[in-house]
Amino acid sequence: MKNTGLCLNSAYFGFYAHAGFVHGLVRGGFEPSIVTGCSSGAMIGALYCAGIDMEEVVRLIQKIRKNDFWEGNALTQAAKIFARGVSRYSGLLTGRKIRALLEPYLGGLKFSDLKIPLGVAVSNVTTGRRELCTEGSVLDSVMCSMAFPFLMEIQKMKGNDYIDGGVVDHEPTKEMILDPSVRTIVVHMIETERETPPRSPIVRAFHASLSIIDHETRDLKDRLALARKTKIVRAMTRTPHLGPDRTHYGETALHAGQKSAATILRSLKIPRSRANGRGLA
């Protein structure tokens, strides 16, 4: 759809709901001119922009289980800390199995190869800056954007260290707001329902910090969008709490994403149209 951007936000194990949401949009005839994504949103956004049929993406996501991305066990993880030392340890997973899972779809692709312009939000630990990747390796950028602190090791790209873009930017819309060719931005947000709050004070403080950053930056971007007369439409999908040992709730999350897409399509009255945007600056 001309002049319309799509943003897939950062969400822990949010690839189920994001896949369902994009699948639902595609079935409804919606095609954005630009896509941005962060963390799990970057993964689904990249697969979609690469031209992978969303039916195939849904099948891929439905099959994901812990063994597809988890590395080792408690003993090998402890040995890893001992071998590297605390000062050089940055996460449980190297990300190699996730990269292998995505390699058949994104391996070797540059951003310039994509069917739809894509921006991937990442956090540059080396420079202390948030970045939106629009050039270079798509897979490298997605891996950096998905490197959730302490779960996945810090990722290397072009000589710099990177972690999950969602640490500082849950919904990367700034560049689209500043792009005069984009008049409407559809943002897919995911909210997970935790059965009980985290008991650890450190974990609670970490999650609270992310939430505060998210709310503050969202408010600023909403003000920027208002000033530039860019319409932001948010679709909220609520899912069960997901994680490495809770992938069995993935199907529920996927269907919830599809329902959110149907709601957005009805509210926006999206016509069947092909994109014709300029890309991200």
Q: Model-found features: residue ranges?
A:
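Patatin-like phospholipase
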Residues: 1-38, 46-281
